Amino acid sequence: LVPLVKGYSTEMSIDVASLGVQIHGGMGFIEETGCAQYYRDAKILTIYEGTTAIQANDLVGRKTARDGGQGAKSIAAQIAKTEAELAASSSADAQALAKRLKAAREAFVEVVDFIAANGKSNPNAAYAGSVPYLMLTGNLVAGWQMGRALLVALTPEAQAQDAAFMAAKVTTARFYGDHILSKVPGMRDSIVAGADSVTALPLDAF
């Protein structure tokens, strides 16, 4: 999970900081609000922590291909357990997230199998989608944690502490499933079927 902490989370910080600039309009672009400084600081994180592509290559090579995807599939198995808990819930939000999580996990496993099969025999194919693989995995793992949080938020103990806060947690998890996890199958397609187009241009085309 180290590449996700260093690569995925720092890429997400850029998106968040960019939205911070955007919602301030023109004021966000100048220095008065401080938003522009946050944006610059977020950008350097994707370099200081080892560039995103380096972290993605580590995820493909040392974290996935080296053991034939066994470590990755171990995480997928843990995610499947959370799926089952969500699906068994009486909450419609939990059941909806379970479906999204299942589709994302299955897409992830397909990518893991693709990388394991091509890591040594066709490394260009395996590494061509390394950054999308990093982002796909990050989206999945974050969705898994959102699912776990949703399950906690539904418990009587949590509801007794702060019902409004817990309701917001449930809604946020549902939103994540509908708007973020739903992207994962498409990311899978670009990784397993898009390698050839990454390397298609000959050198003299540059």
Task: Indicate where each model-derived feature is located.
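Alpha-helix capping/hinge segments and adjacent helical runs
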Residues: L1-S74, R174-L201
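C-terminal amphipathic alpha-helical interaction region
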Residues: R66, K81-F206
